[in-house]
Swiss-Prot record:
Assigned protein family: Belongs to the G-protein coupled receptor 1 family.
Cellular localisation: Cell membrane
Cytoplasmic domain ranges by topology: 64-72, 141-163, 212-240, 301-317
Lipid addition sites, S-palmitoyl cysteine: 315
Principal subcellular localization: membrane
Name this protein carries in UniProt: Melanocyte-stimulating hormone receptor
GO biological process annotation, one example: adenylate cyclase-activating G protein-coupled receptor signaling pathway
Keywords, ordered alphabetically: Cell membrane, G-protein coupled receptor, Glycoprotein, Lipoprotein, Membrane, Palmitate, Receptor, Transducer, Transmembrane, Transmembrane helix
Entry-linked Pfam families: 7tm_1
Membrane topology, record value: Multi-pass membrane protein
Length: 317
C-alpha cells in the first residue's frame, strides 16, 4: 500500500508534493516510460516494526535492570534503543490507523484525524532525529574512550551524559515541531539533509581516526614481539571491513530517505524523481531495518548486556 501525501504532513510531503503527484500520472501517460515501484506489503512492514519494537524494548529493559550498565556509554545505547523503538512504533501506529480507516473500521472527525497525524508526525520526526543524534553521540563517546582513555571517566561523567541526552531529546522535539509546522518550505528539508550529512561525516571521521589509531597500536605490538607483517595487514583489513559495514549500513538505510528529501526540493516535477517518490515506503522500511540492526551492532556485542538479557527473558517466562 503506497502512502499518499494527504495522509502525512512532513513525511507525507516527502512522499509526494501536490505538484509532483498531480503531474505524475500525466507524465507517465505521455512518455509511456515505466516506473520501478517496489511494493512493500503492509504485513511485512508491520512485522519488521514489531521485531524492532521487541528488540529495542529488550535492550532498554536489560540496561535498566543491570546497574553495572548505568554508565554514560550504555546510557547513549539505551537512548538509541528508545529512539529506534519510537521510530518503529510511530510508523507502525500510523500504518495501522491508515489500514483501519481504509477498512472503515475507524470513523472519526477530520479535525481529530489531522491532530492525530500531526502528533504522529512530530513523534516520528523527533525520534528519527534522536536516533541520528545518538548514533553520533556513541561515536563521540567511543572516540573519547580511545584517545583520552586516562581522562575518559572524568570527561564522560554520568551527569554530563545525562545533560547531553536531555539536550538531544529537547532539541529534537522542538526541531520536529518546527519542521512539521513549516514542512512546505524547502529550507526545512535542506536542514534535515544537511543534518544527516553532518552526522555521516562526523561518524566517518571519528571511526576512521579510531581505526588508524587501532592499526598503529597493533603495528607497535607486532614490532615489539617481532611478528610478521601479514598479521598487521590482516588486522587492518578486518578493521576496515568492520568500519565499512558500520558506515555502509548507516548510509544504505538512511541515505535513500534523505536522497528523497533532496529530490523533493530540487526536482519535484521531474519524471525520474517522480518515480523515486513512489518508493517512499521502501525508504521508511530501510530505516525500520536500521532500527533492527542497531542493537546487533551497538548493544548485543556486550557480554554483560547479553547476560542480563538472558535474565530478563528468563524472568519474563
Amino acid at each position: 500500500m503506497p502512502m499518499h501525501g494527504a495522509q502525512r504532513k512532513l513525511l507525507g510531503s516527502l512522499n509526494s508534493t501536490p505538484t509532483a503527484t498531480s503531474n505524475l500520472g500525466l507524465a507517465a501517460n505521455h512518455t509511456g516510460a515505466p516506473c520501478l515501484e517496489v511494493s512493500i506489503p503492509d504485513g511485512l512492514f508491520l512485522s519488521l516494526g514489531l521485531v524492532s519494537l521487541v528488540e529495542n524494548v529488550l535492550v532498554v529493559a536489560a540496561i535498566a535492570k543491570n546497574r553495572n550498565l548505568h554508565s554514560s556509554m550504555y546510557c547513549f545505547i539505551c537512548c538509541l534503543a528508545l529512539s529506534d523503538l519510537l521510530v518503529s512504533g510511530s510508523n507502525m501506529l500510523e500504518t495501522a490507523v491508515i489500514l483501519l480507516l481504509e477498512a472503515g473500521a475507524l470513523a472519526t472527525r477530520t479535525s481529530a484525524m489531522q491532530q492525530l497525524h500531526n502528533t504522529i508526525d512530530v513523534l516520528t520526526c523527533s525520534s528519527m532525529l534522536c536516533s541520528l543524534c545518538f548514533l553520533g553521540a556513541i561515536a563521540v563517546d567511543r572516540y573519547i574512550s580511545i584517545f583520552y582513555a586516562l581522562r575518559y571517566h572524568s570527561i564522560m561523567t554520568l551527569p554530563r551524559a545525562q545533560r547531553a541526552i536531555a539536550a538531544i531529546w529537547v532539541a529534537s522535539x522542538l526541531s520536529s515541531t518546527l519542521f512539521i509546522t513549516y514542512y512546505d518550505h524547502a529550507a526545512v528539508l535542506l536542514c534535515l539533509v544537511v543534518f544527516f550529512l553532518a552526522m555521516l561525516v562526523l561518524m566517518a571521521v571519528l571511526y576512521v581516526h579510531m581505526l588508524a589509531r587501532a592499526c598503529q597500536h597493533a603495528h607497535g605490538i607486532i614490532r615489539l614481539h617481532k611478528r610478521q607483517t601479514p598479521a598487521h595487514q590482516g588486522f587492518g583489513l578486518r578493521g576496515a571491513a568492520t568500519l565499512t559495514i558500520l558506515l555502509g549500513i548507516f548510509f544504505l538505510c538512511w541515505g535513500p530517505f534523505f536522497l528523497h528529501l533532496t529530490l523533493v526540493v530540487f526536482c519535484p516535477q521531474h519524471l525520474t524523481c517522480s518515480c523515486i517518490f513512489k518508493n517512499f515506503k521502501v525508504f521508511l522500511t530501510l530505516i525500520i531495518c536500521n532500527t533492527i540492526i542497531d542493537p546487533l551492532i551497538y548493544a548485543f556485542r556486550s557480554q554483560e548486556l547479553r547476560r542480563t538479557l538472558k535474565e530478563v527473558l528468563l524472568c519474563s517466562w
